Amino acid sequence: MKKTTLLHEGKAKKVFLTDEADLVIQEFKDDATAFNNKKKGTIAEKGVVNNAISCKLFTMLEGEGVRTHLVEKLSDRDMLCKKLDIIKVEVVVRNIAAGSLVKRYGFTEGSVLREPIVEFYLKNDDLDDPLMNESHAVALGVASLDELAVLGTRALRVNEVLKPFFAGVKLKLVDFKLEFGRHHGEILLGDEISPDTCRFWDLETNEKLDKDRFRLDLGGIEDAYSEVQKRVLGSGALS
């Protein structure tokens, strides 16, 4: 499978058309951004790490009944995917209070939430991806109530699968962002699952092992991403 036309370039990935109309190639970049592109940099080999982790986790989720856009891993940086009509909703699941949740509601950082919190954000960089509810999403025409119900249920199912998996490799799944898309009438999980889109803390020390190291200028970014990759892939499947 070969890349043809560049369909879209985002902050962390490029998406290329292929010679099959229903398939695209997602190429992972080393570019790093934070605060909706206000902070920019590069993390060496980030694309390789995130592709490897995402392929492993998507494969695991498929085995647990969560349909994803993954077809196969093509190379270190390239993932062959089903072409999706992306739903302009970012779904965030939170297990532990961190980041904007602490700022908005006064939670103590690190406090375990009684139940996972599911949040919807409008996928719009120009508006800084604002938090929204179901009524906003329907009014904006980005998703129907039925679709939003699927997104919420599917996101919680992903959490049910991934949270114990990460605990098994000594990582706390603090929170994570998911994106979904429509494919021939079906809603599939898309994008990626990686230290770019998740907060991971070491189970014993609470050391941050994700993009917060870039956001907060903590240093050791490459080592943190590599450590997550080692733990995830060392658990037994794809390399």
From Swiss-Prot:
InterPro entries: SAICAR_synt/ADE2_N (IPR028923), SAICAR_synt_PurC (IPR033934), SAICAR_synth (IPR001636), SAICAR_synthetase (IPR050089), SAICAR_synthetase_CS (IPR018236). The keyword ATP-binding applies. It comes from the Bacteria. Disulfide bonds: none annotated. Its EC number is 6.3.2.6. GO terms for molecular function: ATP binding; phosphoribosylaminoimidazolesuccinocarboxamide synthase activity. Pathway: Purine metabolism; IMP biosynthesis via de novo pathway; 5-amino-1-(5-phospho-D-ribosyl)imidazole-4-carboxamide from 5-amino-1-(5-phospho-D-ribosyl)imidazole-4-carboxylate: step 1/2. GO terms for biological process: 'de novo' IMP biosynthetic process; cobalamin biosynthetic process. PANTHER family: MULTIFUNCTIONAL PROTEIN ADE2, SI:DKEY-6E2.2. Belongs to the SAICAR synthetase family. This is Phosphoribosylaminoimidazole-succinocarboxamide synthase.
